[in-house]
């Protein structure tokens, strides 16, 4: 599990971030801090992997907290979630190692993309000791080999495909259903079926029919690891 600290002085926003976080597998909330000092206290009490950091706070702000963490060489990652849209602030947080930056107000889909991308990279770090340039480009920097541009079928979008594929990856090698994905992504089952059909057509997913407790057929999907690269040209 990835241990998370939310640093947010607005209780309503803090609770919203908490609720959003609870909908994404692989993350565990260790605390919510409303100030610079309370954040340092929680960091001293718990092992934290990721901070969801607001910038504007009374007293010392989030940027000062980020600066302090880097001065102490703390091995913690930061995703900024703030109303601060000034380019100077954004540039400074990125220089200090923020891995993503969400400007309030934001949609759940953007939040989920940020967290899912972070989780994916942590998985890469935990399963590799060395990487080739090709692996580094593909796995961390999301650079793609020069290929002929491939269009998605009509009615499908790259952003939704990315979101659904990220959710599919969270199941790892476990089977899943359309309903499972709908709960993860908050996308309708009707829409999800279109994307699953596409992934089945390009042989990235395997599908089997099973029967539920009341006898109705249920389609169980799992990733076809032998052809997993087939999706890259569409993302």
From Swiss-Prot:
* Residues carrying 4-aspartylphosphate: 54
Subcellular localization is given as: Cytoplasm
Q: Where is the Response regulatory domain?
A: 3-119
User: Which segments does the entry list as coiled coil?
Assistant: none
**Family annotation (Gene3D superfamilies):** 3.40.50.2300
Q: Can the keyword Endoplasmic reticulum be found in this entry's annotation?
A: no
The ranges the UniProt entry gives for DNA binding are: 178-197
The keyword Cytoplasm appears for this protein: yes
Provide the function of this protein: Member of a two-component regulatory system MalK/MalR. Activates transcription of maeA, maeN and yflS in presence of malate by binding to their promoter region.
Q: What is this protein called?
A: Transcriptional regulatory protein MalR
């Amino acid at each position: 599990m990835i241990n998370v600290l939310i640093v947010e002085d607005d209780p309503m926003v803090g609770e919203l971030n908490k609720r959003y976080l609870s909908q994404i597998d692989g993350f565990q909330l260790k605390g919510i801090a409303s100030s610079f000092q309370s954040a340092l206290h929680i960091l001293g009490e718990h092992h934290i992997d990721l901070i969801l950091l607001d910038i504007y706070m009374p007293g010392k702000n989030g940027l000062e907290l980020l600066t302090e963490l880097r001065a102490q060489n703390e091995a913690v990652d930061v995703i900024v979630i703030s109303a601060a849209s000034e380019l100077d602030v954004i540039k400074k947080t990125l220089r200090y190692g923020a891995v993503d930056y969400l400007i309030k107000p934001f949609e759940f889909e953007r939040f989920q993309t940020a967290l899912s991308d972070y989780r994916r990279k942590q998985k890469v770090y935990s399963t590799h000791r060395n990487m080739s340039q090709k692996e580094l480009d593909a796995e961390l920097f999301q650079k793609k080999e020069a290929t002929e541009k491939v269009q998605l079928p009509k009615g499908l979008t790259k952003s939704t495909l990315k979101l659904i594929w990220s959710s599919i990856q969270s199941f790892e090698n476990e089977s899943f259903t359309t309903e499972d994905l709908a709960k993860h992504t908050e996308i309708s089952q009707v829409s999800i079926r279109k994307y699953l059909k596409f992934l089945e057509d390009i042989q990235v997913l395997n599908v089997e029919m099973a029967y539920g407790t009341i006898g109705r057929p249920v389609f169980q999907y799992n990733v076809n690891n032998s052809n997993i690269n087939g999706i890259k040209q569409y993302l």
